Amino acid sequence: LVQEKELISKIVWRLMPFLGVLYLIAYIDRQNVSYAKLEMVGALGMSEYAYGLGASLFFIGYFLFEVPSNLFLNRFGASRWFARIMITWGIVTVALAYTQNATMFYILRFLLGVAEAGFFPGVLYLLTLWFPKDYRGRMVGLFMIFSALANAVGAPIGGMLLDLNGLLGHAGWQWVFLATGIPAVLAGIVTFFYLDDTPEKAKFLTEDEKRWLHDRLARENSGMEEHADNGFKALVNPRVLLMALCYIGFPLAAYGLSYWLPTIVRGFGVSNTTNGFINIIPWVIVALALWVVPAAADRAESKTPYIVGPAFVGAICLALSALVTSPTLQFTFLCVAAAGIFAGQPVFWSLPSRFLRGAGAAAGIAAINSVGNLGGFVAQNVVPWIRDSTGNDILPMVFLAICLAVAGVLVIIVGRMLAARQAISV
């Protein structure tokens, strides 16, 4: 007789720490540009706006190749495709260490987006193959905790790497890229041998456990309109398009804050290393919120309050951070805002798998994420533009607050539309 909790626990311990470490590497790799910026701008003779444009080209490559990447993952399997993703993005990151000019920086940032496209939605899709729907919110939350840890760990690492300036003839910003690109390549090799594509192929599960999980997921998937062989149908599903529209504000606020936070803290007059350690604080708070909120949402019938509530708290705190003059109060509000921005996202991601499955889920989740992540492109252009136009490091937070508040309102509207169609419980 299969014990549900024991089986889920076995899968959690096999998959989640490993996927989390991959995301840790991915997120540190993605955020390294915010630390390299502190020296790279001067070294390449770029303005804040020009650097923001280059950094944001990542999201264009990411947007264009996200859906194809997830469909390839569905076809070739997680172990091979995730290995490809990590190895190629590691190689491009190492190449960024040897950027000679702005044009080269622009090209490599675009290629980095192409290389990494499909990783995050790929994991979200993979979780639908392994976990019943009642567990997915918590699993996405657990997975995203590693993004908070990446920001916490990446902050002091980024600061310390900058302080290696001159070591072995390399500038500090070059060390930032080298130290984050090489681990990605190594992790990709390990992924190929460690990761199981589906429960049916998993050697760590018994035949009874495989059968129980298969039957449970089959019951949950019965009646869904997006069939396993029709991924492209999901791309024109109105619910997918509406959810993509809702999601834009969340990455916009997240990238805007995490990209600019080191610059804000540097304005307090601290060293690079101290800057890094101070930036640990908000991400510890985010990690706690990512566990508490999704766990509560999984036990609740209505999911919308667990998405919208944190978003509104985040928007209010972002706005307040721009209104106060005390650095301590500014930083406090930004810490709470960070938690609000991230806490509801795992709950949001538990919704698409309630009406999508198979290749439809792979394509639909990727479409929502790719369109939503255009918010990152907007943030990394508008935030430095506001800074350059006003000369104020903190004023861009007002823009982020407005975008996050609008996202919260859209979630309420779309949630009601989805509920009216009786597709999912929201």
What are these regions (language model features)?
Residues 14-48, 64, 154-158, 257-262, ...:
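Extracytoplasmic
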Residues 137-162, 183-184, 369-379:
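Glycine-rich segments within core transmembrane alpha-helices of 12-TM secondary carriers
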Residues 65-77, 289-302, 387:
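Helix-to-loop junctions at the C-terminal end of transmembrane segments
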Residues 64-103:
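Conserved MFS/SLC helix-loop-helix module at the cytosolic interface between two early adjacent transmembrane helices
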Residues 33-34, 233-290, 345, 349, ...:
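Extracytoplasmic gate region of multi-pass secondary transporters
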Residues 108-145:
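Cytoplasmic helix-loop-helix junction between adjacent transmembrane helices
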Residues 303-351:
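C-terminal transmembrane helical hairpin of 12-TM major facilitator-type secondary transporters
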Residues 45, 77, 98-104, 115, ...:
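Helix-breaking motifs and short loop linkers at transmembrane-helix boundaries and internal kinks
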